[in-house]
């Protein structure tokens, strides 16, 4: 029977990040295929295609994009792998950010034809702030791509991280035939077995005469020159990888499966076991026997048959046991975590035990908030909070059918508690007519879709001219008596805090100037 140390040591928990359409969800599918978690992979797009395993919400299946973060666990090669498949669409940075807080490393998927794109830069910066290992998979080598060396140089120039090519592509587009493994000094030649099945593989040495028959003399000579050029460059440095200053680069095609298995094997070999975490009581060692975890995501209605709400927890230390008693630090109460389960998109499996590095979902009757800490009784430390992004777009929202007020209030409360949207109301009023704030406008579409499909409520929505939110930190009197200007509005959040929405920076200056004693805090303070 494996010891606690051995179980934690074999955990690998990572997030996959990319710009939209770089192939991130397809790569996730192929990891599951090679890991044996699914028998046959489905592509994300195409009218006749199978819906992607990691895309569970109906709107995701319709649009072919990931709009929530999926959590998937599977076993492969002695490792227990937890994949956090993050939203690639630019509008979903908030959910993505929280997911990255739960990862020990990140896989950055880059389109070989397009290189580093805006969303890639944004997500990379979040990873870099945490100094976690970042691996690069240059995808779509089965299409015409840019020069591989040029792509590596662009990653270094645009993202400020060194790179080391772990393998090197042989051809591109229709001529993409395989990769050269620099460590093992051999060619991995691929044959197409159909996109849904594992690619056929032949391994052959660079000096084997049979190689010419496989790839041709010219391509063999070009490869030898490229390998020599790579040899004159940077050395591989494992410590630099672990510190997040050197990114190992792999090439392949998630669609055809070429290069996926070498990448998965190399990644698992190089990346880290669960990392230690900062708390207000110091560093918490992942290998400590005492259980601890934090809530990084809340999701309602993952399965319409259940009509439930799950809190996703990243276990940071020790071992979780189903029937044990735990302590909710923010709630200041002991509890047993109900219906603990691991995920494969919307598929669930009840777990009896889990270890540091694992992600578990527990039934949440409404007591958890994002960022909450759970420990063993007697421990009261807190992990660092997970900030929310300041909403940049606002809409006035109300139900078209006033008879569905109860369903409307339930829906907005549950979806708001998930953190993807912010809900505000007018002071001294109920939630029949609310203001919804989001980071990106696509979240309005998802919100409207979910309210109709999950709660049976059609919405009346109208855009509002606000751009900023400020928290009232100090006010000499009743906030309703403040001198407001055009383009500003007093609001209240779920916690009862008073905020002011502004149409621009000028409005902020006007209010502070004409209301002596008024002190406003920015959104970073609000979110703590």
Predicted regions and their residues:
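Structural and coupling elements of P-loop NTPases
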Residues: 1-528
């Amino acid at each position: 029977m494996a010891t606690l140390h051995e179980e934690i040591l074999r955990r690998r928990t990572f997030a996959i990040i990319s710009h939209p359409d770089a192939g991130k969800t397809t790569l996730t599918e192929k990891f599951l295929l090679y890991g044996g978690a699914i028998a046959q992979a489905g592509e994300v797009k195409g009218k006749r295609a199978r819906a992607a395993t990691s895309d569970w919400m109906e709107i995701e299946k319709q649009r072919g994009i990931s709009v929530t973060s999926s959590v998937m666990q599977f076993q492969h090669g002695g490792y227990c792998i937890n994949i956090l498949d993050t939203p690639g669409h630019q509008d979903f940075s908030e959910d993505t950010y929280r997911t990255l807080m739960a990862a020990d490393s990140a896989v950055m998927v880059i389109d070989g034809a397009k290189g580093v794109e805006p969303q890639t830069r944004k997500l990379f910066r979040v990873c870099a702030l945490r100094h976690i290992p970042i691996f690069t998979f240059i995808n779509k080598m089965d299409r015409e791509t840019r020069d591989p060396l040029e792509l590596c140089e662009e990653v270094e120039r645009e993202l400020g991280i060194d790179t080391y090519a772990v393998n090197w592509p042989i051809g591109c587009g229709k001529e993409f035939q395989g990769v050269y493994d620099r460590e093992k000094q051999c060619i991995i030649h691929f044959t197409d077995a159909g996109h849904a099945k594992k690619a056929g593989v032949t391994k052959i040495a660079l000096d084997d005469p049979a190689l010419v028959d496989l790839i041709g003399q010219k391509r063999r000579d070009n490869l030898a020159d490229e390998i020599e050029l790579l040899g004159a460059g940077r050395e591989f440095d494992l410590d630099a990888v672990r510190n997040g200053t050197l990114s190992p680069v792999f090439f392949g095609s998630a669609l055809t499966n070429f290069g996926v298995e070498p990448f998965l094997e190399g990644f698992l070999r190089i990346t880290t076991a669960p990392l230690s975490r900062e708390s207000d009581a110091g560093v918490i060692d992942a290998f400590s026997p005492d259980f601890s975890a934090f809530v990084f995501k809340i999701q309602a209605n993952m399965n319409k048959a259940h009509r439930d709400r799950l809190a996703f927890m990243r276990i940071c230390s020790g071992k979780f046991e189903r029937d044990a008693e735990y302590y909710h630090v923010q709630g200041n109460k002991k509890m047993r975590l109900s219906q603990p389960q691991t995920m494969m998109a919307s598929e669930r499996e009840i777990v009896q035990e889990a270890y540091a590095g694992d992600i578990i979902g527990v039934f949440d009757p409404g007591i958890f908030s994002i960022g909450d800490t759970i420990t063993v009784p007697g421990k009261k430390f807190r992990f660092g909070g997970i900030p929310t992004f300041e909403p940049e777009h606002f809409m006035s929202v109300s139900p078209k059918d006033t008879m569905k007020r109860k369903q409307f209030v339930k829906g907005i409360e549950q979806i708001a508690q998930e953190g993807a949207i912010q809900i505000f109301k007018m002071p001294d009023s109920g939630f029949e007519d609310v203001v919804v704030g989001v980071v990106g406008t696509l979240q309005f579409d998802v919100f409207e879709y979910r309210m109709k499909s999950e709660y049976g409520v059609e919405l009346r929505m109208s855009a509002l001219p606000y751009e900023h939110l400020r928290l009232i930190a100090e006010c000499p009197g009743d906030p309703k008596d403040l001198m407001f200007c055009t383009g500003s509005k007093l609001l209240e959040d779920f916690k009862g805090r008073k905020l002011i929405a502004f149409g621009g920076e000028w409005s902020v200056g006007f209010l502070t100037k004409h209301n002596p004693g008024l002190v406003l805090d920015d959104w970073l303070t609000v979110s703590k």
